[in-house]
Amino acid sequence: MKEFVTFVPGINQSRTATQLKSEMLKFYDQNSFNQDYHHKEVNLDQALPSSSKANALSLDKGDVVISNSLNLATLVSEYNINKVLSLNFTKVEFNKNDLDKRYFLYLFNVYRGVQRQKERKLQGSGPILRIPIKTLEELDIPLIPIREQERIGRIYSEVLRFQGKLSRYSDLIEKFTNSILEESIKGGK
């Protein structure tokens, strides 16, 4: 994998705030990741060019971020532009155009071959197990033609988008049902 991507670890929030003496930094946190993962579609055609970044840890729309605690990856949405990665996250920088970002997401999040490799290499104790960057670099991925990668990546993104809509729809149905049930109880008194 290391021939296609570079993994950039996040930074220690407290140390950074002390060193930079700045309260203005907004950090990419678990809520940010969840917002991106249960996502709005990120249009990669409108993603900002990497040269516009203030530093390597400042995020732009379309960047790929891995949650070290969940061992899942997602695309950064416009809602999290310019946030800085904390230690809980790793940024994936693509070195070449040989690997599609959405295809990478599919491989990292779902593909059984990569899942087995990740499970064997998990480190830590307790409920949160992490994958070291060295191990991420050594993941073996199937490389197929770029057009096929793009097709698989688009399908995977559409499935995630559809799942997000279904989840929101399910929440609305539950709220609506609960509201009707409460009103029927109040009306019954």
Model regions and ranges:
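Charge-rich amphipathic alpha-helical interaction elements
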Residues: 3-8, 51-53, 65, 75, ...
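Alpha-helical membrane-embedding segments
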Residues: 80-85, 118-124, 159, 165-166
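Glycine- and charge-enriched low-complexity intrinsically disordered segments
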Residues: 101-125
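Non-catalytic DNA-recognition/assembly elements of restriction-modification systems
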Residues: 1-24, 143-189
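Short, surface-exposed loop/turn microsegments at beta-strand edges and helix-strand junctions
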Residues: 18-25, 45, 57-59, 76-89
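A short glycine-rich beta-alpha junction/loop motif
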Residues: 83-90, 123-150
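A short beta-sheet element
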Residues: 67-109
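Sequence-specific dsDNA recognition surfaces
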Residues: 2-16, 31-61
